[in-house]
Amino acid sequence: MKIWRFLLMKKQTRLPFDNLPFYNKVMDKTAIKKLISRLIDHFGMTYTSHILDQLKTSGFKQATDTAISLGIDDLLTAPSKGWLVQDAEQQGSVSEKQNHYGNLHAVEKLRQSIEIWYATSEYLRKEMNTNFSMTDPLNPVHVMSFSGARGNTSQVHQLVGMRGLMSDPQGQIIDLPIRRNLREGLSLTEYIISCYGARKGVVDTAVRTADAGYLTRRLVEVVQQIVVRRTDCGTVQGIFVSPIRGRERDINEVVVRTQILIGRVLADDVYINRRCIATRNQDIGVGLANQLRNIRPRPIYIRTPFTCKSISRICQLCYGRSTTHSHLIELGEAVGIIAGQSIGEPGTQLTLRTFHTGGVFTGDIAEHIRAPFNGKIEFNENLVYPTRTRNGHPAYLCHNNLSITIDGQNQVQNLTIPPQSLLLVQNDQYVESEQIIAEVRARTSSFKEKVRKNIYSDLEGEMHWSTNVCHAPEYVHGNVHSILRTGYLWILSGGIYGSGVVPFPFHKYQDQVDVQPFVAKHTDSYVDQVEHRSGDSNCYGKEEQIFSYSETETDRTISNEHRDSIYVTFSPKNYNMKGKKQMNRFIVSLQCDKEWGKRIIPCPDAILRIPKSGILQINSIFGYSNVEHGIPDGPNMTTPFSLDLSREGDNLQIQISNSILYEDGERIQVMSDTSIPLVRTCLGFDWEQIDSIESEAYVSLISVRTNKIVNNMVQISLMKYPPFFMGRRDNKASSNLMFHNNLDHTNLFSSNGASQLISKHQGTICSLSNGEEDSGSFMVLSPSDCFRIVLFNDSKCYDTGNKSNRKDPMRKIIEFSGLLGHLHSITSRFPSSQFITDKKVLSKKHSIFHNYFMDENMRISHFDPCRNIISNLLGPNWCSSSSEFCKKTFPVVSLGQLIPESVWISEDEPLPESGQIIAVDEESLVIRSAKPYLATRKATVHGHYGEILDKGDTLITLIYERLKSSDIIQGLPKVEQLSEARLNNSISMNLKESFENWTGDMTRFLGSLWGLFISARITMEQSQIHLVNQIQKVYRSQGVRIGDKHIEIIVRQMTSKVLISEDGTANVFSPGELIGLSRAQRMDRALEETIYYQTMLLGITRASLNTQSFISEASFQETARVLAKAALQGRIDWLKGLKENVILGGMIPAGTGQHIHRSGKRNGIDPRIGNRNLFSNKVKDILFHHDKVSFFSIQENYHNILKQPLKES
C-alpha cells in the first residue's frame, strides 16, 4: 500500500504512469529484482533509492510487530513419508538382488540407489510444502522457508522431511541415506553419516572462502587496466546470438533467451522482408528484444568485447549498457574491475551454502517422454538397437528420428523420438498413462569426470570370463586386460594350498584329499630314508599326520578283492616306481607282493583287468622304472615323490599286451586304431595295520579323450568298500553291467550306497585352467564349495525288457556320471516310441542304441562294439523327452555350464546360488559355487584366465563418467580450471580438432593459404564463446546470473597474446616470445617481413604475469624475478593501468566525472543510417588490415557471394 500511495503522489508531477503495473502479491527475491529494474527504468536512480528505503523501513517494522518464533510443535512431518520411504527401500532391495545375480555392477547399483533416494527426498519436500499450505499456511516454519531470507526449503526439509543423502569428506555421495529428520532424531549410524556432511560444510566454508577470495584477486588482476576510453572503435565484427533456444525441460516447450540480448549493441542492421527494424550500433532494450524474439528466427549479429579494436581498453558500443541503469556505459568506467568482482563475488558468498544432496542427480540431465494415455505402443524394431541405460536397465537406442504410435482404446497418437534417445519400452507393449517411454539426451552435456571404480572379489577361487577380452595397450606384457564387450566374469569357488607345505604325492586334477588338516598340520618327512625291517616299512623322520589314511603305514599290499577293477603289477624286483607325467598321463607308483589273499599269483610285467563296460585304448598307461636311483622296498604313499629323480634315459617302458583278460581268462582282442577312451577303472589298495581296523584306499582313474586331448583324473578316498556297487551278471557275453554312483554332500564324488567314508572332510583337487604347471600350489574344492541339487525326484522310466530284468532294480536305467564324461550303457531301456532327442519326441519305429557316450565338449556319440563306429547323436544342448507315462522333461544342462542364481532347473525350488555344473547324474547335479560379476565395455580385468584369486583381491576396474556436482562449492575448482586454461580442460582439447575441421572446409573454398588463415581465426573465436558458456554453466546451476559481457572481458584478456614462432623472426621478435595480438598485427603491417605467430589461450595467472606493466606484474607474483628481468631488459612502465598508479600514489586513469557533449553522430557515422562502407571494412578486417592483397579467382567468387545478401538488403 505504501508503494501505491507513493505512485499516486508522483502522479501529480505529470509523469507517464499509464504503463506502470500494479503489484499486489507476495514477492520473493526474484520478483523484487524485477520490480527494482522497472523502477529504475521509469524513475531513475534517485527516486528508486527513496522507494527502496521505504520498503526496508516497512519490512523491519512488520517483522518486529509480528515477532515470528519457532517451536517444536511447528515442525510437522508429512503423513506420506512412511510409504514413500517403504517404497524406496523396496526398490533398493530389488537393485541389491540384481547386483547379487550379476545383472548390475557396483556403479549402476550406486546410481540407482542415489537416484531412488534423491527422488524420494525431493518428492517428500514437495509433499511438505503442500501439507503446510493445506493444513497450516501461517506456520512459522512454512513462512520462513519461502521468505527468501537465510533459511530455505532445503534446510526446512531436513527438519520436518528427511535428512537425505550426505557427502563424505571427498565430496562423494554416500549411498546410505538418512531416513529420519532432525525432529524425529537420528540413529547412531545416521548421526555419524550426518556428521560427515556437517563437517564438510564447516571445512568448505573455511577453505573455499579463501579459494574464492584468491580467485577474485586473480580475476581483478588480469583485467584491472580495462577502462572505457572511447565511444566506438569502428569494428565490423561481432558474434551471432540466437534469441530462441530449443527444447530444454519439455520437447514442446521453447525457452526464450531474451536476457542475453538486453543491453547489447547491434553489429549489423536487422531486416525483415526488406524492412529495417533495427540499425547498426543501436542498443537493445526490452521492447526490441521481445520484437526480435517474435519475428526474427535467425541469429542476430551483436557487438562483443571479443572484437573490440581498442588496445588494452574498450569502447562503449562493444560493451553495451551498464548493468546498473538502462543507458550505455559511461566513459571512464573501470569495467575490468567490475567484471572481476562480478565473477568472484558469487563464489565468495555462495561458499556459505551447504548442499548435501548434490543437485547433479536431478532430472535436468535428460528429458522424459511420457505416454499421453493407456494403449499399445508400436514402432519399427529395425531402426533401434539394444543397449543399457546408465542405471543398467535394458533399453533401445535410436540413431535417427523414430516414429512411434500409441494405439489407445478410442484414440491414436503419433510421437517422434529425437535421435540418440533411449526407448525404455518394447514393441507391442501395453503402456499406462504418464508412463516414461523414452529418455531424450540433453542438448548441453553437464560437467563430467572419468572415475575408476575397483570391484573386489567376494570369495576365493578361480577366475573365468565369458566375454571377449584383450591386453590393455599400456599393459601388453602384464596381467591387465580390457573388456571388448559387456559380459560376465566368474569366480569359481575353491581354496589354494601350497604343495611345499603339504606332502601329497597325487596333487593332480580331480584328486580327492582331506582338506581339514591343511590349515593346522605340517610335516618334515624324509622320502629317501626308508629301510626294510622284519617285514615292516616305516618312514623315519619328523612326521605329523596329514591325511586321514596316513595312520595305516605298515605292510601295505596290493589287493584286488572285487571284480571288474584294474590293477597293475610289476616284476618282483622290488623296484620303487616314480610318478612321471608323460603324454598327459599320470602314472601311479606301486609295489607288489607275490601273495594275493591265500594264493600265490605270478607277476608278469603288466596285467590289466578291466570291467566289461569300460573301454581301454592300447598303450594308454605306461610304467616307468629308475634303476639308478631306486629306493628300497617300502610303501611311500604318504610322502611326495621327487620327480627330479626320474630321467628320460633311465626310464624302462613296460609294454601292455594287446589283449584284455576277463574274469574267467577269456581272451578278447582289442580293436586297433581306434579313439576309444578309458572311461573309469579302479586301483585298489588293501592297507593292513597291526593294531588298527582294516581299511582300504582306492585310487580311481578317469581318462577322457576329446579332440585328441586326453584328460586324466585321479580320485583317492579312504573307504571300507570299493567306491562302486557292482551288479550281478546273468550272462557272461552280455554287456549290460552298469556302474552306480550317487553323490552325497560329505563326499561329492563317491558312492553313498555300500561305501562309507571314514574321513568327513574330503576335497577334490582342481587343476589350474591357465595351462601352467605350478608345482608349488594347487586348488582344492572342499564340500562347502559344491552343492547338490535334485532335478526330478518322481521321474519314472519304464522298461520293456523281460520279467527278470524288471525284478532287478539295478537293471533299470542307471547312468554313470563321471566328472568330465559320461558312459551310458542302455539295453532296451526305452520303448520304441521314445528316445533321447533334442527337445522333442521323434517318430516311432526308431532303432534303439545300446551305448552312447557324452564327452567333455557336451557331444553325445554312439558306439557300436561290432562295427566300431562313433556317430554324433545329439547337439551340445540336450534333454530327454518322456513318453506318455513321464510327463516331465529334463532341463537342458551340460557339463561346465555356468548357471546364475534363482534359475529354475528343478521342480522344487530355484537354484540357491550361482555355480558351475561339474557332475551330472540322472536325477541330480553337482554344482561348484561361483559368483558372477558384470563387466561393461572398456573395463579393466586384473589377472589371467584361470588365475587363482584370494578374497578381497582387485578383480575389475570399471571406468565410467560421473557428473560433477553442480554445487558452487564443488564448482569453484571447475571455474578455476577453466580460468587457468589447464591442459585437461575441454577447451584446450577441442582447439586442435576444431581447427582441423575448419581447415578442411575452408581449403576447398578459398585455397590452402586463406583456408588456414581464416580457420585459425574462426577456431579461436569459437573457443572463446565455448569458454564463456562453460563458466556460465557452473554459476547458472545454482541460480546465479552473471552478465556474459563480464566473462567476455576476462576471456578477451586470456586470448590477447600470441606466441612468436621461429620462422623469419630473427630481426623482429625473439622466438617463443609472448606479445599482444594487436601489436603483432601492427608490426606485420609496418614491416615488409612477415611475422609468424600462433594464438594462445593463457590462464589468468600467466596472463597477469605477461602485461605491459612490470610494476603490476611484480606486485602480483614472483616479485624478485619480474623486477630483475625488467631491469635487465630495460623495460619502461607507462603507468596506463589502475594498479600501478595506485602503487605509486598517482591519479588513476578512470572516472566518470568529465562532461562530454553527446551528438547524434559518433566518428562521423550516423547510428540511424549506418556505415556506407561496411562491406569494405569487413573485407579489410577479415584480412587483418593487410594492404598488399592479391585476389585469385576463388577469392573473388567468395567475396561476390558475400556481397549478395548485402545488396538485397
UniProtKB/Swiss-Prot annotation:
Q: Which GO terms describe its cellular component?
A: chloroplast; DNA-directed RNA polymerase complex; mitochondrion
UniProt-annotated binding residues for Zn(2+): C233, C308, C315, C318
Catalytic activity annotation: RNA(n) + a ribonucleoside 5'-triphosphate = RNA(n+1) + diphosphate
Which molecular function terms from Gene Ontology are attached?
DNA binding; DNA-directed RNA polymerase activity; zinc ion binding
Q: How is the cofactor bound?
A: Binds 1 Zn(2+) ion per subunit.
- Chief subcellular site? plastid
The top EC class is transferase
Which cofactors does it use? Zn(2+)
**Record keywords:** Chloroplast, DNA-directed RNA polymerase, Metal-binding, Nucleotidyltransferase, Plastid, Transcription, Transferase, Zinc
Domain of life according to the entry: Eukaryota
Q: What is its EC number?
A: 2.7.7.6
For this chain's UniProt record, which GO biological process terms are given?
Answer: DNA-templated transcription
Where in or outside the cell?
Plastid, Chloroplast
Query: According to its UniProt record, which protein family does this protein belong to?
Result: Belongs to the RNA polymerase beta' chain family. RpoC2 subfamily.
Function of the molecule: DNA-dependent RNA polymerase catalyzes the transcription of DNA into RNA using the four ribonucleoside triphosphates as substrates.
Subunit-level organization: In plastids the minimal PEP RNA polymerase catalytic core is composed of four subunits: alpha, beta, beta', and beta''. When a (nuclear-encoded) sigma factor is associated with the core the holoenzyme is formed, which can initiate transcription.
Q: What is the name of this protein?
A: DNA-directed RNA polymerase subunit beta''
What organism is recorded for this protein?
Pinus koraiensis
Q: What is the lineage of its organism?
A: Eukaryota, Viridiplantae, Streptophyta, Embryophyta, Tracheophyta
